[in-house]
Amino acid sequence: MAKSRFEYVKQYERLDRLLPETYIVIRIDGKGFHKFTKKHDFEKPNDLRCLNLMNAAARVVMSEFTDIVLAYGDSDEYSFVWSKSTELYERRESKLVSHVCSLFTSAFVFNWPKHFDIPLLSLPSFDGRAVLYPNMKVLRDYLHWRQVDCHINNLYNTTFWMLILKGGFTNTQAEEYLKGTVSAEKHEILFSKFGINYNFEPEIYKKGSIWIREPIDQEWHQQDKKFSVKQKKKMVLSILHVSLIDDDFWTSRPFLEVLLQ
């Protein structure tokens, strides 16, 4: 940038560098998606086309930022987990959040025709935020929270929409019918009224989607404390629909904690 007498205005910029040695999670959420889904006549309770589109957009973000180790998404939200040691953009919050959010949104629009056979009728938008977590326990608890939220919402929505689509209920009647019910009761409603065993519903609906960056280089061993630059370049992105809450997710993938350092 050329120097001039007007350069003094830079002093009014706010310093927003995120704390060092913390895990950065950038979460994006659909803005006004209830109206957006209604306008595009999304299937209820889940529209697999949109979930696949969200996953495709998340993959674009993961491919662009190699310091993102893991991402978790369900419905109209996605959380991107960064390596604790990342120094991208000098950890400036505004830069990181705006780049992730804008790239995700543009990837969503760009890939729309690959997943929907109708034109885009209105502009999708997403907001974003950055949250810092001090250690692996809290970071894992954050991911557990998002996945539990996915399960609770999906069980409710599945039961709610079956009552409307197949049970002849109105929205208000379905809400009143489900008021105060617990998970076991919703399972029973689905099975007794509609012959649906919720346990056999697609995992992507119940558990959400997890993108991970994983090595294909068999020379890396669990006792290794870091990956070489060459090994990182060989890594591939894989999508999973499994439980994040079980310890097995982490113990069977020890490379994740190494990458997150």
Swiss-Prot record:
The name this protein goes by in its record: tRNA(His) guanylyltransferase
Annotated EC: 2.7.7.79
Domain of life: Eukaryota
Name of the top EC class for this enzyme: transferase
Names of the cofactor(s): Mg(2+)
Reactions catalysed: a 5'-end ribonucleotide-tRNA(His) + GTP + ATP + H2O = a 5'-end phospho-guanosine-ribonucleotide-tRNA(His) + AMP + 2 diphosphate + H(+)
Residues holding Mg(2+) 2: 29, 76
Protein task: Adds a GMP to the 5'-end of tRNA(His) after transcription and RNase P cleavage.
UniProt key word Lyase: no
One Gene Ontology cellular component annotation held by this UniProt entry: nucleus
Cofactor binding mode and count: Binds 2 magnesium ions per subunit.
Coiled-coil portions: none
Record carries keyword Transferase: yes
Positions with a binding annotation for Mg(2+) 1: 29-30, 76
Keywords from the UniProt entry: GTP-binding, Magnesium, Metal-binding, Nucleotide-binding, Nucleotidyltransferase, Transferase, tRNA processing
The family this protein is said to belong to: Belongs to the tRNA(His) guanylyltransferase family.
GO MF terms, alphabetically ordered: GTP binding; magnesium ion binding; tRNA guanylyltransferase activity
GO biological process: tRNA modification; tRNA processing
Residues binding GTP: 29-34, 75-76
